[in-house]
């Protein structure tokens, strides 16, 4: 191929080749190169005559094969005879992966290349070019969307796996890094310990040489020298932390570098609740405490230059915060953070403590880092050593020195306990002795809590832990005494005491031995308190000791609850054994976290639910279930549990548990009363440190206050400073009678000796009363009792689980200057009003509203709590008061703060405070709110005397007297609101709802107000663009499949019953026939109405919105749409009926409205002076009742009333005319049982109705009877010479006329005048009536209203247009509950056959279908309801089942075999008859059968009625085992054997059903047998037939064999065995001749023998 790529060369001397030769050589070369892809297209390529080449090459991209090839093409070349001198024809075929454009481009290039190589063989060159072109365009084809999605998913999955692998590798690196870091920390810790050990040895040697010498202030300190102090700093009050919780978390932290100071150091800033910050230079670490997990640093306070010590705890977690923490790990970290942050509140109380034998806490700081939280606490610097050094180096301490140490330890410990602080870890290492020999106690309370938190591994899995300490851990204050005894014993022996039980050496002095026994006795009850130990002879040796040692005084005031309580360290620990804990719901479900408060009522404890992890406040109250107040307690708990409002503390659960506890006069319960003050005052300790503000127990903590802590007094400055007052003079509300109105949620406000008004704890009897008297003696006179004996008694505790509020109280907020923030002030006030409006609506009164009872949660929202005096009674009398109450009211404690009594007295309303008996209502809370609102708007009052004076001036009976600095201009609105609230006349005082609607309150603020403003502006401009946009967005919402399914799921439950539908149709047809007899026509009104607030002021209609945003209503009843229709069409005369659906909205969102079927019958007439239409309406309902025997049995009564008479009664009872509509609504809700009696009374109280007026109103509305019987009551109204008499006469005249007309119409029902009937009074004028029967439901008789209506002339003009003229017609209407009639008939009238058709036409075979169709058409023409069976292939059994299910009596079988005849089957009275009838006579035959059937049913109904009447009159007795015959009626014995227990009414219904069903058969059998019994069972028809196989006449063995065979074939063997046993008993034992086995499930029976 000369000139071609790869062509063989030709020599110069060789002759030139011919065209065929050249062509043949090229083809051979191409075939060799391309092999199978080469194809010679010549038909005779091997023939003698050579044709020009015509070949096809299948070409692929060069060098690619298999899956890499995405393109290919066939190159077809047809050469002319003179090729290659003439260009061949080139074609590209079967292109794959190339677009048409690419193919055309390739072809044009090939043609150009062919022209270029003309004269040379070129096919290989062309093929090579094609392959190169294919290589350039070898690209995968575009994928489908599905393939791209799969590929994308695969890539994402691959990426996810790579990312997971990368994270795993990163975590592995972090773990390895952390392990390395921990190893380095351990090495550093070992170094520090070695250095500390050396320093301790040096200090110990120095202290042994001279205990009285002073140490160099600049010398090194070890862990034994834990404190050093500066007198200036101790006396500097500005560094004490206050109760501010939010700013304390805003810590600043910085590190000094070498440029700032000569040596590198850390600077810590402590926020002290003021603009000034305490700056402390953190120095060298001087030691550590492994037990408490802390590090100790020297520090310098820059403001005074004094030395302080810095304690540091570090909570470290293994991983760094970030995306590599699991959600569970993050929750654990958050939990630990909250626990640490909660310690700040406790520290606020501890910082206030000051005692010569207690080391002072100064300030606290929290520092959050990426992988840890650092807690720094500044403490007083003490120059001295710990007692641990004495144990290590000095040996035993002499007794005289030990006595001195013990007295100081007891003094400090008693001071801590008197302030409700428990040390928890008292040991030699945290008791210091300074240079003067003074003992100092440190590390109390908070150190143990922080140590427990920081020692816990955040990511540690739950496992069994073993304590390193062999000695048991004792909790509470008695635990501190236990540890004190061990400490003293160790000091006396010179070594640690690790023996348990503790053995006291006999070589110790006798008084010291006895002292130690009082400390380390195993029984907590017998262990003495520090107060008692201070009086022990070891501390106070006496020259003459009595022969019989006296027991310390009774410890009634002892506190068994610590301040901050770790898990299982609460007061219950000492009294509840481990076995009791295992069966206690409280200990099983909750983990105790903290005591929130306690008092005479019990204790409130912060707990965490182990299941949901949420925190709750649990109130634990000792109760006596046998007491008369226990029912009252349960009622209050139930009442409060119903409250659910965002501004009310939520009560969740309540339960009672029984526990065993030690009993005795010296052992109060764990939740006993507070600590008495007398002994502390006697020792010279300031009362202000032990009561009121300085109570640490009450101080734990403000951010996490309980929702209902009821040990508060309003005189405290903070919720964190509440402590229960004791003694008769410190009660809060002595005017409240606990027996009548108080309860478990209130404090004991009476003296301790008045036991009748308190809750009875445990088993209180005469002994306990005398014990209380003895305890009073101990308090007042200091007399002592002997040690009690150890006994046990059962105690019951009521546990109440409540919502837990975290922040503070309104008292805290007021004291912090709430008056400056006006916006927040009004917002909180509005939230208080919202909460009060809610509880008042529920019929409750708080009665103890004050700032400390109003809590603020973490979101700064109000939560009203402390329902200690809350009550659900209508009105209360302030009965007898204490004569000296006034003197007690204005009294302050030595600290300058008010007592609890002052707090309540300053807020209580005049009607409650009055000395005379007077009723009061919810408005007493509004008066208290007035005082509260003044305090919110006024600057905090510093002294108690100022506050008493200002608030008493504000309570002036004439008008409130405001302070001069309460500016009129700035506080104008506040003054108006306060004056309105503090009106001494309750009637002029507003309700919470009225005040919320008042213009005196500014609108809601912030985002809520802005949103409301935008929505209001948009909705007012219905033609604006914004309105259309909002509507478009609303109607473009997507409905999810879940909502679509659940919207009407309760309606479409699959419980459709054809019989129910047919019964409803039967009822409607029957009622319509009655209406038509009265000349009524059917008239249905439009479905939708525009929303009408005036008409539906009370009734809640189902509201919807159309596409334009207009609100429309579905009909609530059929009366309003008809009145609108009459008014708009000027109808003057019409009788109409209508049966339509009415709707009720659901309380749940996104649910289909509830549908009811209602029937309306109305008479509109132009005659205005006749009462005959009213009587006709009532008579029509009477006819309906008579039509249905099921309704006759219910004994309906007709209730009548008149709107004029009702109005006269309300006006007579003192109800203003402008409030009549509200009273109508309340009375209507009461009648329909929408409101309880308590709620009704509460709503009346809100209308300022006096108790006398309310009693008079009840006297009238409860009257019901004949008109003559009520005349004395009605005449009392007529005697009045006011407009009321005219109203009464008008109403009485109408009632007399209607009653007379009803008698003339022959109505046999009882007609009663019901003065309390208030059926839709706003819509009616004149006579109103109801048909009422009392039926038994759930063991009580409840009224069922079948129909109700009245005259509604005045309703029509409300719908007339402005141009409408002409007279207003008289309109009377009644609404009938169709659903109730259908249900009654369905349940009581099983004998009524209601068929959807008279005749079923069946084609026997497909060939007869045409005849069947023609026959059916003739039946329809004749007016006979007929159906044709669509499926001609039905079997006989299926046909019978279809007829039975649809209650079809007659079947016409059309078959070609019968010729011109039709076979008619009849299913009548369990008899099947069959008759051949000519096809032409079928219509007449069926008409005759139907007439006969109607007659038989009428006779059967009458017989059934007679039977039912005989049954009701007791004419036969099943118990006698006999039956009686009344004429031709047989009354057999009927036994109902059901698989489950049946109610009496259901059993009677089945018995009546059986007797009616088998009446004909029984009459026929009466002639043959006199002993007949019926056994009714709940089995299907098929099973009934199986019983025919039983052997009755054989022996017992044969019978049992057939029973086993029967049971083996059927399910429900247990029930079937009972049926068989009963049958055998009837046959063998009773020897009954005839037994019917009847299935009340399928209405089928068989005669067994």
From Swiss-Prot:
Homodimer; homodimerization is important for kinase activation by uncharged tRNAs. Interacts with GCN1; this interaction stimulates EIF2AK4/GCN2 kinase activity and is impaired by IMPACT upon a variety of stress conditions, such as amino acid depletion, UV-C irradiation, proteasome inhibitor treatment and glucose deprivation. Interacts with DNAJC3; this interaction inhibits EIF2AK4/GCN2 kinase activity during endoplasmic reticulum (ER), hypothermic and amino acid-starving stress conditions. Interacts with MAP3K20; activates EIF2AK4/GCN2 kinase activity in response to moderate ribotoxic stress. (Microbial infection) Interacts with hepatitis E virus (HEV) ORF1 protease; this interaction inhibits dimerization of EIF2AK4 and prevents EIF2AK4-mediated phosphorylation of EIF2A. PROSITE patterns: PROTEIN_KINASE_ATP (PS00107), PROTEIN_KINASE_DOM (PS50011), PROTEIN_KINASE_ST (PS00108), RWD (PS50908). It catalyses: L-seryl-[protein] + ATP = O-phospho-L-seryl-[protein] + ADP + H(+); L-threonyl-[protein] + ATP = O-phospho-L-threonyl-[protein] + ADP + H(+). It is found in: Cytoplasm. PANTHER family: EUKARYOTIC TRANSLATION INITIATION FACTOR 2-ALPHA KINASE 1, EUKARYOTIC TRANSLATION INITIATION FACTOR 2-ALPHA KINASE EIF2-ALPHA KINASE -RELATED. Residues 705-717 have a biased composition (Polar residues). Residues 25-137 form the RWD domain. Keywords: Acetylation, Activation of host autophagy by virus, Activator, Adaptive immunity, Antiviral defense, ATP-binding, Cell cycle, Coiled coil, Cytoplasm, Disease variant, Growth arrest, Host-virus interaction, Immunity, Kinase, Neurogenesis, Nucleotide-binding, Phosphoprotein, Repeat, RNA-binding, Serine/threonine-protein kinase, Stress response, Transferase, Translation regulation, tRNA-binding. Residues 778-787 have a biased composition (Basic and acidic residues). This is eIF-2-alpha kinase GCN2. Its EC number is 2.7.11.1. ATP binds at residues 596-604, 619. GO terms for cellular component: cytoplasm; cytosol; cytosolic ribosome; nucleus. Residues 1-25, 138-158, 227-256, 660-750, 766-788 are annotated as: Disordered. GO terms for biological process: adaptive immune response; cellular response to amino acid starvation; cellular response to cold; cellular response to UV; defense response to virus; DNA damage checkpoint signaling; GCN2-mediated signaling; learning. The keyword Zinc does not apply. Belongs to the protein kinase superfamily. Ser/Thr protein kinase family. GCN2 subfamily. Residues 237-249 have a biased composition (Basic residues). The modification N6-acetyllysine is found at residue 1259. The modification Phosphothreonine is found at residues 667, 871, 899, 904. One of its GO terms (molecular function) is tRNA binding.
